[in-house]
């Protein structure tokens, strides 16, 4: 989600503010790139791993160490990319055609979870066939499987009051754009954003209503673990919820799209603590939170926070930050 027309945008920053608009009318300007860091954080290399796609958003590292990149358009695809840039990226139409925001993988149950960034978006899962990802196999082929949509017992708003049961229903036409094939009894989520699977739990964010949701895949329940509209001090500090990442200890790191341009830590007990804030880039958004293998460095982007070619910052080129993190996250 970093606009700027590739090399041309970096050469002529004045073009960056209209990058997203032009991509709407001229698809294929998107893609994904890789940065290679040394153990000390020094950048050693950079290269493209995906190109000629449109509005690439979040993604995920697969258990077999490739990268999945999501296209955020109504006919969007998920693409599998070689992180070394050797093999050509390949589209994965079996995972559905919709405004893909993010994807998470439960390798134990062999299930993919996906968010849809639309005001009337749904929450999806994709279950590969036994032949596509056999038990004991190191990876899925991602060619054949079942696309399903989340259904909640009663009103999905009941999840504000505690866990409610959910089930899955098969997509009506899995090979067509899902905006044209809505199932009326499936749960509606206002702007699906980041999603993360860990320890039988699936967390995902919805930006339209500033909520963080949790699926308990063992109990088959869903609940809201954060809601800006009902949050009280000191926890009412998180808005514009967007990309999410989890630590091995169960904390959810939520990046803000706008809001106060913060990364906020949501602890398992429900407590919220701001980790960092970017000042002076209110028209940007934070995304792409990732950690170095030793856990000592955190990387994240400000998608439109860079020079805009008009003597200032904001609505400009993307920026990448490195944060040297403490041994423990702040808890006060």
Q: Where is each model-derived feature located?
A:
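Sequence/structural signature of beta-propeller domains
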Residues: 1-332
């Amino acid at each position: 989600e970093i606009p700027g027309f590739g090399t041309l945008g970096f050469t002529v920053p004045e073009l960056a503010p209209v990058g997203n608009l032009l991509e709407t009318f001229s698809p294929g300007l998107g893609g994904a790139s890789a940065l290679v860091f040394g153990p000390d954080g020094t950048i050693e290399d950079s290269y493209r791993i995906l190109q000629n796609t449109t509005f690439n958003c979040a993604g995920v590292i697969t258990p077999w160490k490739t990268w999945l990149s999501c296209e955020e358009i109504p006919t969007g695809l998920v693409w599998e990319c070689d992180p070394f840039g050797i093999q050509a990226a390949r589209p994965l139409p079996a995972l559905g055609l919709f405004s893909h925001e993010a994807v998470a993988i439960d390798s134990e149950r062999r299930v993919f979870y996906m968010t849809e960034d639309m005001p009337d978006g749904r929450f999806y899962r994709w279950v590969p066939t036994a032949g596509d990802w056999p038990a004991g196999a190191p990876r899925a082929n991602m060619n054949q499987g079942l696309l399903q949509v989340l259904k909640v017992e009663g009103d999905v708003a009941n999840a504000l009051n505690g866990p409610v049961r959910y089930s899955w229903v098969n997509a009506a036409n899995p090979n067509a754009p899902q905006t044209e094939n809505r199932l009326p009894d499936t749960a509606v989520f206002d702007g699906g954003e980041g999603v993360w699977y860990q320890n039988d739990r699936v967390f995902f964010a919805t930006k339209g209503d500033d909520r963080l949701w949790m699926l308990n895949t063992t109990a088959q329940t869903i609940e809201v673990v954060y809601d800006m509209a009902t949050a009280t001090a000191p926890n009412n500090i998180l808005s514009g919820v967007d990309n999410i990442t989890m630590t091995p200890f169960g904390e959810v790191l939520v990046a803000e799209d706008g809001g106060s341009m913060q990364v906020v830590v949501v602890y398992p007990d429900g407590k919220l603590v701001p980790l960092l804030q970017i000042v002076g880039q209110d028209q940007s958004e934070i995304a792409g939170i990732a950690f170095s293998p030793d856990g000592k460095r955190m990387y994240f982007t400000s998608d439109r926070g860079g020079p805009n070619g008009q003597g200032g910052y904001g609505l400009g080129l993307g920026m990448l930050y490195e944060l040297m993190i403490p041994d423990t996250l702040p808890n006060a």
